[in-house]
Curated annotation (Swiss-Prot):
It comes from Candida albicans (strain SC5314 / ATCC MYA-2876) (Yeast). SMART domains: HAT (SM00386). The gene is RNA14. It is found in: Nucleus; Cytoplasm. Residues 379-449, 725-745 are annotated as: Disordered. HAT repeats lie at residues 44-76, 78-112, 119-154, 165-198, 231-263, 273-305. It holds the Pfam family Suf. PANTHER family: CLEAVAGE STIMULATION FACTOR SUBUNIT 3, RNA CLEAVAGE STIMULATION FACTOR. SUPFAM superfamilies: TPR-like. The keyword Nucleus applies. One of its GO terms (cellular component) is cytoplasm. This is mRNA 3'-end-processing protein RNA14. InterPro entries: HAT, Rna14-like, Suf, TPR-like_helical_dom_sf. GO terms for biological process: mRNA 3'-end processing; RNA 3'-end processing. Component of the cleavage factor IA (CFIA) complex, which is involved in the endonucleolytic cleavage during polyadenylation-dependent pre-mRNA 3'-end formation.
Length: 791
């Protein structure tokens, strides 16, 4: 949902003008281009139609269907010179069966067979051969081949040698045609065999047998193609992107077709012919799915694998004039083209590519920022001063409270600190309790003569969801801009040295929402250019902007550990402690405000959780370093401070964390019977480890006791707990059933029900093939339970 813009709109009757305005804002809107072209053709303003077609085809230059529409428009007005110019433009840049058929039809129409004779026929044959060489391998090219055969069959020779020439030409066309797996190849084969038999039954079997092998391969290929594409592959242009379900489905079909071609199921001996087929399919895929960067990337990658030096310029042209014209905000294609320019020693062109992407992303970022500002302005109306009497002390106290309640972003300290955000205040007439009583201790004190309600947030759930959506999009764009600047800076260092990289870094810092990663990468570039003092200055500069960003500070700490700067490490830990503690306190105060919608509350809680998580991680990293390279006194000092900050945490977790082998806490695993992931002190779960956790095995193992094996004491304890739970279950059943036993309960009994309700479900133990469950101990456990029904 977008906020309406305050701009004048054209009258609804002016459809053409409105479409033109919309296309000025978004020139990649394929559907609106088609609507505009159709409207103009109806209006029949020739110059306007031509201008619109020209503008459209500069962007969608490969759209064969639109070229056909443009040419037919000119043919209807008998503009032959214009038509020929259009054919010259389009036939070199797009491969389209219907466009080639239109070209051949035009050549036949302007050729005088009466006076031209054999020469005129030769011109048409050349046109057919041109079209066949261009699109004859297309699975939909049957109509073009049939046109060619029918044209040759319509020739009425005057001499015997001309008759034989006609037969040879037709047989030659059939020979090429029947090796192509077209849609109705079986019908075409029947047509060919009938022609041979009618021509000369004595020689028919000879010619037919010569082609039957290739025909069988083509027919098998056609069957396989229909199977892998479910007969659902669409060849027309799809204006959707990778988020569109239909596009995802079509992409799957195109990739399957490409794999089929690469497998060479037609058993083509000439590799150049097979390569031509593969490239043709790649082209058709980019025509059908122009807004899917993956297709463009893979096409270029294929060309470079086949012949890197020979296809370098073609790859650059393909991305510059095709992929990035249609996907100007694609990081994938931008970085691919930038690398190609760099390999071609054309870094100035690479700079342009990077800057174009930054401009496009910045434009979108500014648009989202404006939408956020308008939304906040709408949901934060000015306080009615007539109903609230405030003296100077009140104003000062409010300012202090606002400064104490700075609102960070959704990542819990993972982004740059922002100025104190403006509170969304409750209108005096809209308070929850309708009184000026104190609410959760948050009411601002006021003189006894003043009537004042607590200062709280006021935002509807719908507005909160919309704001969250905008903020997520803003974060996505901020990350994309940061990534682009980082890679631009690194590429500049490779090509032009550290000074040019510094210029990019300086430019990146002008973006107010630049990510912390740019500081880390810039510092590392300086470090590996033997500028360690400069690297430290950059890290220090980043620390000022990202004082509560856990990810930045962890990277900073890693760097300080690498260069063994103990004093700065200690300073970073101490300042981070103070900054994080203050920020957590501010957020906790905000949580006390009334009328917080669930989304905002969850957002604040997430920020607090993340801040605590990263503060723990910082302490853990430094304590581990101190225990390894400094002294136990330093280690104990910081460990004590950490335990004071997080008194509810198990001290064993912190202690054993510095006694890991690689990243495995063997002590907890072998001696305490705990999963290292579940009790990890830093609270950060690696995705691979998380999957391992879901599939963990319950086995004794060889030579060691299992963390989850039951000994005799554990069994007794488990039985006792189950007996207690059984009593509760039995009571609930008695109340529910009122003395009437259900069949399933009389079979298993309340003890088993209690046990099963206490155990986790089967998926908790992983796949059946991976789990090891001791059935004997389970039977022993069941046997010791009371209230087991007898058979």
């Amino acid at each position: 949902m977008f906020i309406p813009q305050n701009k004048s709109k054209r009258l609804s009757l002016d459809k053409i003008g409105q479409l033109e305005e919309d296309l000025e804002l978004n020139p990649l809107d394929y559907n609106k281009w088609q609507k505009l072209i159709d409207q103009l053709i109806i209006k029949d303003n020739q110059e306007q139609v031509r201008n619109t077609f020209d503008k459209y085809l500069k962007i969608f230059k490969f759209d064969g269907a639109s070229w056909c529409k443009y040419i037919k428009y000119e043919l209807n007005r008998d503009e032959k010179e214009k038509v020929e110019n259009l054919f010259q433009q389009c036939l070199g840049i797009t491969d389209n069966v219907e466009l080639c058929r239109l070209y051949v039809d035009y050549v036949r129409g302007v050729t005088d067979f009466v006076t031209g004779g054999e020469k005129a026929r030769g011109v048409v044959v050349q046109a057919f051969e041109f079209a066949i060489n261009k699109v004859g391998i297309d699975i939909t090219s049957e109509s073009l081949w049939q046109d060619y055969i029918q044209f040759l069959q319509s020739w009425n020779p005057n001499a015997n040698w001309e008759q034989q020439q006609k037969i040879d030409l037709i047989r030659k066309v059939y020979k090429k045609f029947l090796t192509i797996p077209t849609e109705n190849i079986e019908v075409s084969w029947s047509q060919y065999t009938k022609w041979e038999n009618e021509l000369n039954p004595a020689t028919a079997s000879k010619f037919i047998s010569e082609k039957s092998g290739e025909f069988m391969l083509a027919r098998s290929w056609n069957t396989e193609f229909n199977r892998i594409t479910d007969k659902s592959l669409k060849r027309n242009l799809n204006p959707g992107d990778h988020n569109d379900e239909d596009v995802v489905k079509q992409l799957k079909y195109w990739l399957r077709w490409l794999e089929l071609e690469k497998e060479n199921k037609l058993e083509l001996k000439d590799e150049t012919v097979n390569d031509k087929r593969i490239q043709y399919v790649y082209k058709q895929a980019t025509y059908a799915l122009p807004f899917v960067p993956e297709i463009w990337f893979q096409y270029v990658k294929y060309l470079l694998v086949q012949n890197e030096e020979g296809n370098l310029q073609e790859s650059i042209r393909l991305l510059k004039e095709g992929g990035l014209v249609l996907n100007p905000k694609s990081m994938l294609l931008t970085f691919q083209l930038a690398e190609l320019y760099e390999r071609d020693n054309s870094f100035n062109n690479a700079k342009i590519v990077f800057k174009n992407l930054l401009d496009a992303l910045q434009k979108d970022y500014n648009s989202v920022a404006n939408q956020i500002a308008e939304l906040k302005e709408r949901i934060d109306p000015a306080t009615d001063k007539d109903n609230i009497q405030e003296d100077d002390d009140d104003n000062e106290e409010e300012e202090e409270e606002e400064n104490d309640n700075d609102n960070d972003n959704d990542n819990g300290g993972d982004s740059k600190q922002q100025p104190p955000s403006k509170k969304l205040k409750l209108n005096p007439n809209g308070g929850q309790n309708g009184s000026n009583s104190e609410n959760n201790g948050e009411a601002v004190s006021a003189p006894s003569s003043s009537v004042k309600l607590p200062q709280v947030y006021r935002i509807s759930l719908a507005d909160s969801k919309q704001l969250l959506s905008f903020e997520n999009e803003q974060k996505r764009l901020s990350d994309a801009i940061t990534l682009t600047y980082v890679k631009f800076m690194i590429a500049s260092k490779r090509s032009e040295g550290i000074k040019e990289a510094r210029n990019v870094f300086k430019q990146a810092r002008k973006f107010t929402d630049i990510g912390y990663q740019i500081f880390i990468e810039s510092a590392l570039l300086e470090h590996y250019s033997d500028k360690k003092s400069t690297a430290l200055k950059i890290f220090d500069l980043g620390k000022k902007n990202f004082a509560t960003n856990g990810k930045f500070l962890l990277n900073y700490l890693d760097y300080l550990i690498m260069i063994n700067d103990v004093d700065t490490m200690r300073t970073v830990i101490q300042s981070s402690d103070a900054n994080f503690t203050k920020e957590i306190g501010n957020l906790q105060e905000e949580l006390k405000l009334t009328n917080l919608d669930p989304i905002t509350r969850k957002k604040l809680e997430k920020q607090i959780t993340n801040l605590k998580k990263f503060l723990k991680q910082l302490y853990k990293k430094y304590i581990s370093f101190a225990a390894t390279f400094l002294s136990l006194d330093v280690t104990h000092s910081f460990a004590k401070k950490c335990e004071q900050l997080f008194p509810k945490d198990d001290p064993i977790d912190l202690f054993t964390d510095r006694y890991k082998l690689d990243n495995i806490n063997i002590i907890k695993k072998d001696e305490l019977g705990r999963d290292d992931i579940l009790t990890s002190f830093d609270g950060i779960i690696d995705e691979e480890e998380l999957q391992r956790l879901k599939r963990r095995k319950l086995s004794n193992g060889s030579g060691s006791s299992s963390s989850y094996s039951f000994n005799e004491e554990e069994s007794k304890s488990a039985i006792k707990n189950i007996e207690e739970q059984k009593t509760r279950v039995q009571q609930e059943q008695d109340q529910e059933n009122q003395g009437i036993n259900k069949p399933e309960e009389s079979f298993v009994g309340p003890s088993i029900i209690a046990l099963m309700s206490a155990l986790p479900n089967a998926s908790y133990f992983g796949l059946p093939s991976e789990s090891v469950f001791n059935s004997e101990k389970l039977v022993t456990l069941f046997a010791n339970l009371s209230n087991i029904p007898s058979q």
